[in-house]
């Protein structure tokens, strides 16, 4: 186990003493050592209310091999050995003597586990106070810091009752859980947008669900975590809407110019505002939906309000889904504008009684994963005032890069046949309200049919419709600071979405952080080896409470999880910056690779059918040295590596090839060869319900990325796809003459991949990808001129 810690601050001793006093702990370095130790350890068991109960707790803790804590305190000690202090500390952190660590050598265990310690015996009261401060900021076996663990056991449960005016509490630069999340005020409002996405001539009203600390009723203004969550009110069955992968790849007769595929700015109709009949501070509707996002819940107990809005076309709101369209962005922005006092909301949909976000400080962060993070990115690219930061986990930065790739229809990994219209059906939760749907059904079906036409599964081309869903082109508008989190094995929302957005905001005068993990399409707030919650606490305390805690400097610019050594995270100044710490190598496919042939015929669809394969089994088979697809691919290998290398950036291919058809699909996979127990891409549960989000509040599982129990012969590093008629970009088209050689350029998905010595790089070139592209039945023959083809790889030095 490694409990990496990137968010711990080390203030000077005077500041430490002030903070200890602030939370009610001993803080006088002149006080007797024994009295300070007794008071400190008593405070470390907040669940024990009486001295007798405290003595029982002390007796359960070993100080060394011959003395428990009760016995040690009874001696009225004047000092404490370093080993004794950390024997006690480890038990307080949730570790077990005799099974997790040896009482004769706690420091060795702490070093391996990456836990901090003081370097000497505690000879004076000041030493004890300093060591105790460090302990409070140290992570427990249960992922959170020791002070968080104390709070979960009731340390702060009466904190607000002791003051006339509720307030946030800071310790080690982070806001603490001094608010009772169980008493959160739950309410619903309807925000009037400028959007008319269902074309009924009225401004769409957007429902927003609010959870705010009860302390706001006593005058406390709080910042807001806002999650634009299209799934908030449920989803629909999409079986009937899901596309069967097409069997014919259309020949494109012509392309388009850059101007033709550039979306014009969306025009907003001039619609009358609803009349206001009165104003109130009291909501008229209770929030019956529970908060679904543990990350937000964690901050609710720390004095942040949490707001969810599903947006246009969802249950209890107006409008239609537009899947990444400007209407969805505008809907999210409308919520922020209400939270910052610049837009109107109502207590219900009909009587015109207005309500303000009077409890909001006007400082907002957008949070969430996947579609939720996508809308955070979209919101940031508007430059809306009051949005201070986004924490976007696996978000889409261009919808074309989600459903298309280089002129091809390419499904998100694991969702073959999905497209924008399918997701529209999935998230159109207004369908769940029969009374709403009876008057909408025809208009919705017409809207959906138009979306199906606009998305254009025939050509897969980049069009103005997709351009309107490309947030990166508006990246220059971003004013909010940005945290991006993405899985290096996320083939659903592929890494390009994060890295291209990271590059797009690189030169902006904002703070930005990038976290890359070894998972698929998953959250990381509950990954044990990373102090993500503490990192984001430090970040949001700075961003939303205005605390000068050096979050920008303390948190790494880029943090990457290693794919070889478990529970290892490395900090870097940037990602794939060719000007720093990188070297690029270009390999010729003929002279620098070995290959048995330079041609293949793509029988993948027939083989897929004959083998009764699934998308998952195909993805495994296509990168396996000996599989049923051996004749439907080129298999090129480099020599075995003599030393470790770290691939980081965007691999690039320049290919010269010929096909016997006027069009074709080309798929490429870069593969790590060599038997090894590689990481599972889904994190394993290591503590069921082990992460507590507040005192007597919700819990969630603690997870960790672990090596598999069995060896595998290969592992996908990255991949890419291209329509051979789109060798330059996704909108210009070239005519292919069958049998005649032509040139294609292709970027693979960005990656960071540690290749150990003894492994081999393999490049697999094939045709249709049964898991992601359409599935043509026509057999196409491919011949490559390997001598005129290259692979460029960026490596971290």
Curated annotation (Swiss-Prot):
Keyword Amino-acid biosynthesis applies: no
Function: Removes N-terminal dipeptides sequentially from polypeptides having unsubstituted N-termini provided that the penultimate residue is proline.
Active site: 370, 490, 521
Assembly and oligomerization: Homodimer.
Predominant cellular place of this UniProt entry's protein: cytoplasm
A Gene Ontology BP annotation from the UniProt entry: proteolysis
Keywords: Aminopeptidase, Cytoplasm, Hydrolase, Protease, Serine protease
Phylogenetic lineage: Bacteria, Bacillati, Bacillota, Bacilli, Lactobacillales
Species for this entry: Lacticaseibacillus rhamnosus
Catalytic activity of the protein: Hydrolyzes Xaa-Pro-|- bonds to release unblocked, N-terminal dipeptides from substrates including Ala-Pro-|-p-nitroanilide and (sequentially) Tyr-Pro-|-Phe-Pro-|-Gly-Pro-|-Ile
Protein name per Swiss-Prot or TrEMBL: Xaa-Pro dipeptidyl-peptidase
NCBIfam families: PRK05371.1-2
InterPro entries: AB_hydrolase_fold (IPR029058), Galactose-bd-like_sf (IPR008979), Pept_S15_Xpro (IPR008252), PepX_N_dom (IPR015251), PepX_N_dom_sf (IPR036313), Xaa-Pro-like_dom (IPR000383), Xaa-Pro_dipept_C (IPR013736)
GO CC annotation, single: cytoplasm
E.C. no: 3.4.14.11
């Amino acid at each position: 186990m490694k409990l990496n810690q990137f968010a711990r601050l080390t203030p000077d001793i005077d500041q430490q003493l002030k903070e200890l006093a602030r939370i009610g702990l001993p803080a006088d370095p002149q006080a007797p050592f024994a009295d300070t130790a007794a008071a400190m350890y008593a405070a470390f068991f907040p669940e024990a209310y009486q001295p007798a109960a405290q003595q029982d707790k002390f007796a359960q803790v070993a100080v060394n091999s011959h003395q428990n804590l009760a016995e040690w305190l009874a001696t009225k000690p004047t000092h404490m050995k370093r080993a004794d202090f950390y024997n006690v500390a480890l038990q307080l952190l949730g570790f077990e003597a005799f099974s997790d660590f040896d009482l004769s050598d706690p420091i060795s265990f702490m070093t391996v586990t990456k836990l901090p310690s003081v370097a000497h015996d505690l000879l004076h009261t000041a030493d004890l106070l300093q060591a105790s401060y460090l302990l409070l900021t140290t992570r427990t076996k249960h992922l959170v810091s020791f002070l968080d663990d104390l709070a979960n056991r009731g340390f702060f449960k009466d904190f607000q009752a002791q003051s006339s005016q509720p307030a946030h509490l800071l310790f080690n630069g982070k806001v603490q859980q001094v608010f009772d999340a169980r008493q959160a005020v739950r309410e619903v409002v309807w925000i009037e947008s400028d959007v008319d996405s269902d074309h009924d001539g009225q401004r769409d009203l957007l429902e927003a669900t609010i959870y705010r600390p009860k302390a706001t009723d006593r005058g406390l203004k709080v910042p807001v975590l806002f999650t634009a969550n299209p799934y908030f009110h449920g989803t629909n069955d999409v079986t009937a809407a899901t596309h069967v992968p097409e069997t014919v790849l259309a020949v494109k007769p012509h392309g388009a110019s850059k101007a033709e595929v550039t979306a014009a700015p969306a025009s907003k109709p001039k619609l009358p505002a609803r009349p206001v009949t009165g104003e109130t501070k009291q909501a008229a509707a209770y929030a019956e939906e529970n908060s679904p996002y543990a990350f937000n819940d964690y901050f609710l107990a720390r004095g942040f309000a949490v707001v969810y809005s599903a947006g246009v076309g969802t249950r209890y709101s107006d409008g239609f889904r537009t899947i990444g369209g400007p209407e969805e962005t505008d809907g999210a922005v409308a919520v922020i504008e209400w939270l910052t006092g610049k837009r109107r909301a109502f207590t219900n949909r009909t009587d015109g009684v207005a309500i303000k976000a009077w409890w909001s400080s006007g400082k907002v962060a957008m949070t969430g994963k996947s579609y939720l993070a996508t809308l955070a990115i979209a919101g940031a690219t508007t430059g809306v005032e009051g949005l201070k930061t986004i924490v976007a986990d696996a978000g889409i930065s261009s919808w074309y890069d989600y459903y298309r790739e280089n002129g091809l229809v390419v499904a998100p990994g694991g969702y073959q046949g999905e497209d924008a219209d399918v997701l529209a059906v999935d998230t159109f939760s207004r369908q769940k309200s029969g009374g709403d749907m009876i008057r909408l059904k025809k208009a919705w079906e017409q809207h959906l049919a138009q979306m199906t036409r606009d998305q254009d599964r025939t050509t897969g081309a980049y069009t103005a419709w997709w351009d309107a869903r490309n947030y990166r082109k508006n990246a220059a508008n971003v004013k909010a600071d940005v945290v991006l989190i993405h899985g290096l094995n996320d083939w659903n929302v592929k890494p390009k979405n994060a890295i291209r957005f990271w590059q797009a905001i690189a030169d902006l005068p904002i703070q930005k952080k990038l976290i890359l993990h070894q998972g698929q399409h998953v959250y990381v707030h509950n990954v044990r080896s990373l102090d993500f919650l503490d990192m984001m606490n430090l970040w949001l305390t700075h961003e939303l409470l205005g605390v000068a805690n050096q979050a920008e400097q303390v948190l790494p610019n880029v943090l990457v999880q290693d794919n070889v050594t478990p529970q290892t995270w490395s900090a870097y100044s940037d990602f794939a910056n060719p000007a720093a710490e990188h070297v690029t190598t270009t390999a010729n496919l003929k002279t620098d690779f070995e290959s048995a042939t330079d041609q293949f015929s793509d029988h993948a669809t027939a083989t897929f059918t004959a083998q009764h394969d699934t998308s998952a089994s195909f993805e495994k088979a296509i990168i396996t040295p000996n599989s049923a697809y051996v004749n439907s691919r080129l298999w090129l290998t480099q020599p075995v590596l003599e030393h470790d290398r770290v691939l980081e950036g965007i691999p690039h291919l320049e290919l010269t090839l010929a096909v016997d058809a006027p069009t074709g699909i080309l798929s490429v996979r870069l593969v790590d060869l060599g038997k090894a127990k590689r990481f599972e891409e889904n994190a394993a549960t290591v503590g069921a319900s082990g992460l507590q989000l507040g005192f007597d509040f919700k819990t969630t599982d603690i997870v960790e990325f672990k090596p598999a129990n069995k060896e595998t012969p290969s592992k996908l590093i990255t991949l890419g796809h291209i329509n051979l008629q789109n060798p330059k970009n996704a909108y210009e088209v070239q005519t292919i003459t069958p049998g005649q050689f032509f040139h294609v350029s292709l970027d693979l998905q960005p990656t960071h991949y540690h290749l150990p010595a003894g492994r081999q790089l393999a490049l697999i070139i094939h045709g249709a990808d049964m898991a992601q592209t359409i599935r043509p039945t026509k057999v196409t023959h491919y011949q490559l001129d390997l001598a005129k083809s290259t692979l460029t790889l960026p490596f971290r030095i």
